[in-house]
């Protein structure tokens, strides 16, 4: 199929293959969720602003996107998320006070929150109809370009950021790509699970996807994690607004439709450790891991943890 693309009055034609190989510079961050697992904290602050050590979850997601070459950041938000917008705004009063006190190190830290003018956009998801619907809400900003999706709940610790690893693989394959990891069979019902057509090591050719299958229905133990590189055709599939698991519009179903249309979908086994910061246990595990990884905190924090474990053992 050929596509007519209009850009500032210039017309071009591109094949599907050319679109699939185009460089990915846009990312969608679905951040409209209420974060009810973290009430009462999330009554007044977005879950994405909750911090691992001294950085909010959204900062880890932004840093990963930047490292992968993303230039345009699209946030799909909802009511009560204004703190996310404030976080990426300039803070002249704070900066002036830090300059007055000569706190150059803190001024330098604030630079990570700086966004280039026009690089960030906010789209409101009016109704909570699922992840697929949240992605679909950004369709006009995506237009006919391939794009990434990052779920800030999934924080991945790795030497090379997960999305950057995926981008390198995508440059060779094109198509649609999802981050994947092995999960225990009893936990498969919490994920989208891949049906594997060909296992090539880090890369897996996918023949099907099932959202939150029952344990006996899971086609493999390879689960989808919150990183995606997708073609614009996904938006066409989402536009049909078919309800899937839990009565929601599922992104997994839109990707599965690409498989049915004989378009390439790959799973990518990333190198790194994933933390589910959408759960309290996962958030605490990430806090410990990221705290221990900090040179300025490791010794004191490790000693504290050792002491806590010793006290618990002595009390048993």
Task: For each feature predicted by the language model, list its residue ranges.
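Catalytic-core segments of class I nucleotidyltransferases/pyrophosphorylases
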Residues: 148, 167-171, 200-303
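Conserved beta-loop-beta/alpha segment of the NTase-like Rossmann-fold superfamily
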Residues: 94-97, 108-196, 232, 238-241
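N-terminal glycine-rich phosphate-binding loop and ensuing alpha1 helix
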Residues: 21-99, 125, 161-165
């Amino acid at each position: 199929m050929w596509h007519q693309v209009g850009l500032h009055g210039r017309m071009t034609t591109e094949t599907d293959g050319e679109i699939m190989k185009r460089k990915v510079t846009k990312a969608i961050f679905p951040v409209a969720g209420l974060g009810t697992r973290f009430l009462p904290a999330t009554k007044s602050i977005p879950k994405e602003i909750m911090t691992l050590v001294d950085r909010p979850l959204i900062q880890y997601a932004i840093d990963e996107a930047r490292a992968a070459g993303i230039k345009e950041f699209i946030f799909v938000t909802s009511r009560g998320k204004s703190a996310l917008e404030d976080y990426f705004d300039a803070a002249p009063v704070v900066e002036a006070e830090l300059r007055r006190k000569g706190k150059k190190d803190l001024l330098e830290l604030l630079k990570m929150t700086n966004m280039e003018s026009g690089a960030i956009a906010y789209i409101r998801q009016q109704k909570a109809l699922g992840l697929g619907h949240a992605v679909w809400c950004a369709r006009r900003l995506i237009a006919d370009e391939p794009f990434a999706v990052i779920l800030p709940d999934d924080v991945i610790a790795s030497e090379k950021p997960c999305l950057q690893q995926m981008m390198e693989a995508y440059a060779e394959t094109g198509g649609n790509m999802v981050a994947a990891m092995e999960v225990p069979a009893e936990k498969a019902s919490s994920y989208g699970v891949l049906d594997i057509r060909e296992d090539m090591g880090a890369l897996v050719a996918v023949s099907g996807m099932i959202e939150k299958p029952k344990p006996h229905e899971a086609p493999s133990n390879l689960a989808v994690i919150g990183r995606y590189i997708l073609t614009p055709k996904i938006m066409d599939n989402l536009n049909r607004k078919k309800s899937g698991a839990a009565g929601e519009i599922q992104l997994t179903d839109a990707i599965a439709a690409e498989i049915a249309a004989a378009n390439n979908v790959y799973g990518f086994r990333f190198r790194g450790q994933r933390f589910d910061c959408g759960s309290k246990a996962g958030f605490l595990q990430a806090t410990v891991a990221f705290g221990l990884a900090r040179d300025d905190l490791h010794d004191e924090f490790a000693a504290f943890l050792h002491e806590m474990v010793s006290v618990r053992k002595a009390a048993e």
